[in-house]
Amino acid sequence: FWPGPLTLVLNRQPGCPVALLTTAGLDKIAVRVPANKHAQRLLQICDMPIAAPSANPSGRISPSTADHVHGGLAGQIDLILDGGPCEDGLESTIIDCSGSAPVLLRPGGIARGAIETALQSAGVTVALIDTPTINSQTGDPQQPVAPGQLRSHYAPEAGVRLNATTASATEELIGFGPVAGAGQLAMSFSQTADLREAATNLFAMLHQADAVTAGTGRTIAIAPIPDDGIGEAINDRLRRAAAPRD
């Protein structure tokens, strides 16, 4: 899966040269090898690991274009390296490999089934274990060990209603498959019910819907998305986008 959207969480070894500041005080380190050609070139030029935090305000919709990054962080960063729209749309799948069994910390651009198949072909027959969602509203003492574990995350300013098949007069409906989009933009994640296309469009369309409803009191409705394959990751993002704000 490397280069590609897979992050592995490993135990930090004694003498590890990576700065402690990048591990948020944890004794683990997360490693990924991006496939984007511009990111690959940057790594070659730097010739060292790069600490890469999320390029958006915490808790808000993830960026999938340079314009999204500029909209969220303008005035706070010196440079944006524009490699074009994200091909996968979703963030990486995060697997914790620091213990006795692999743990799925965040579903993402590589589906659970594909990873389990790869593990089985390597002689690892255990299924991926899910990590619990963390709810900061209830004073949950558990510290997040990966991005996107809080109940509310990836959230637009507008409220979000899931599994909608029709839209009210005050909603912007993003469709999928047989459920057509409605509202000012009338968008669909995928008119052909293609989950990969839906993943690619997910955050870009959430950004568009949030922009068109801003200051109007209108909200966002989302058509049902199957939980198969990469649909698990899409629904993970949508549930967190729709959750009460922490």
Segments from the language model and where they lie:
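Active-site-adjacent structural elements in enzyme catalytic cores
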Residues: F1-D246
